[in-house]
Structures are given as C-alpha cells and as structure tokens.
Amino acid sequence: MNKKSRLVLVDGSAYIFRAYYGLPPMNRPDGTPINAVFGFTNMLVKLIEDYSDDKMIVIFDAARENFRNKIYPEYKANRGEAPDDLIPQFSIIRECVDSFSIPQLEIEGYEADDLIATYSKSAKNNNIETIIVSSDKDLMQLVTENITMLDPMKNKKIGVKDVEEKFGVKPEEVIYIQALTGDKVDNIPGAPGIGPKTASQLINDFNNIDGLYKNLDKIKQEKRRNILIDSEKEVRTSLELVKLKNDVDISLSINDIKTYAEIKNQNKKIFKFLKEQGFKSTYERLKSNAFISNNIEDNKIETVSKPNYILVNNKKEFENILNEIRKKGLCAIDTE
C-alpha cells in the first residue's frame, strides 16, 4: 500500500440529512425530489477533487434498530420518520456513490459510526492517517493526532485541540462526558441536571465513570452527589450506548479500497448519472475537469421542454419585471 495514501471515511448518512435541510426543495423534471442528492453529489465531487490520491469509502447507517436498542429499547425512540420527500432520495444517493465507483458500506445491526470506528482502529494499527468526513460529536471520541475530522459544510478540520476546547477533556474521555450529560436527540438518559461543564469537572477530577463512582464521598455538593447515586444505572447504560464498537466484522479491508486516481477510468457512469438527475452545472464543471472527465464523450444534457424566458438587458425591461414582482408579491430566484 502506498504509505502516502490516507483513509477518508465519509459519514454518508449524516451528510444526507445536512444536505436535505441545508438546501431548498429541488425536483427533477419527472417530479422526483433531489435537493439532498444535489448537495451530496457536490460534496462527493469536492472530496474526490481534494483527496484523489487517498482511499475513500462512504459509510451509511443500516436499519434504524441496532445492538444499542437491545441495551436500551428507548434508544432513539423519540426520532420521527424521515420526511416523505427525502425517502426516495436515499436510493438515488447510493446510485451517486456507485457512479463514482467509490465503495460504500452498511452492515445490519450497526450504525455508520461503529463502522467508522472499526476502520479508524484498523488504520491506526497500520499507521495510516485517517480523515473522518463528518461533524458528528459522537465521532469525536475517535480523534487522535493521526485521526482528524472534516466538517464538509464548513470545510473545517477538527483535531485534538478542537475536541478538548469543545468538551474540556481529551477525545478518548468524551464518552464519559456524554454518559453523564445524556443526549435528548438520541434519547440517552445520562444523569439529570448534570451539564457539560459539571461533567467536565468531574471527569478531570476522577478520570472516568468508575473513578467517579469510587470517589462519590469526595463530592462536596450533596445534591450533585445524590443525583449521581440515584442515576448510576442510567449513567452506566449511557456509557454503553455512546461508546462506539471498533471490532465490527468488515469484509472490505483497507487494502481493498482503491484511490480515485486508480479507478478514474471508470467514470462514464458519472456523467450518465448527472444527466439523469439534470445536474447541468455539476456536469459542465466536471466536463472541464481533465482529471475526472478523461475520455468522456460530450453529450449534452437533454432538456424536457424548450426554454421559455424573457431576457432583461435594459433598464426599462428591469423596471417592468420589478412591477410584475410587486403585483405578484413573491419572487423565486434560481442561482444554479
């Protein structure tokens, strides 16, 4: 394996939702919603351009229930179903990943975070630098000097110091903070009334959950001590929920993952996919990218109907348009 190649782990499921909620509704000519597909596609293109010499895999959550629901049946029970216009986009996004010939993986019974933790451990054992493409706080427990995170929306890297500033403890101690504070979004109980600041103080004083409960007599605040005593079972359950599994049986090894530079000759599927979705701006941008568009025939994206527009190229026409907008009371602008 090329020692210079890094491992790029893309948290696909998390980014789908960020793309969906971060972009306005968009539809294909046939009415299929594609705003999340559009955002995801452009994120993937940016990653390929930036990390073409590195090994990349996109990881998704499988079914909603996993081994954590056996530990705590109420885990994530408060989450509703995905929006109706997002559901049909899941399969299209998987088509997108396939069109770029990037490997993708999901395993029944586990969350994407567990697979990311497993790959990160394997990479660490083989001295391979790892980049986790996600801003999910649950993954920050994995950060080391050799494992960083990348927030694709902000194009910001998250390292050890960033995690320490956020939680007040080392990355490997983040799980203790989460066990104490709980998580309303994921329905993780924690200890009621224990916030991040207090949790940070406790872990800095006692190192971990076991150390904390062995030294409850050293906690001067009676109310705090009683809360911890009463919620010990919930705290220990929460610790099991937030700790990521790093030993999932994965058939696709790091050595089996190729860099994009090695697979770019399979890129005809990319342009076929972009045409099918009507992503004209992305199509044109990639067509001019010699690295991605190697030997691609220039087939224009077919339009469903003839263009119908008014060209505004003088002040009078502009004023007429403004008057029309005032009459209607609403104006939509497409900046693609």
Over which residues does each language-model region extend?
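Short hydrophobic beta-strand that contains or immediately precedes a catalytic carboxylate
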Residues: 9-10, 134, 331-333
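Short alpha-helical segments and helix-capping/turn motifs at coil-helix boundaries
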Residues: 40-46, 117-121, 226, 318-319, ...
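Short, basic, glycine/proline-bearing loop/turn elements
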Residues: 24-33, 97-107, 298-312
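Non-catalytic, usually N-terminal nucleic-acid engagement modules in DNA/RNA processing proteins
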Residues: 1-61, 67-71
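Extended two-metal-dependent nuclease catalytic cores across DNA- and RNA-processing enzymes
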Residues: 2-5, 24-27, 77-251
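Long, highly charged low-complexity segments
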Residues: 257-336
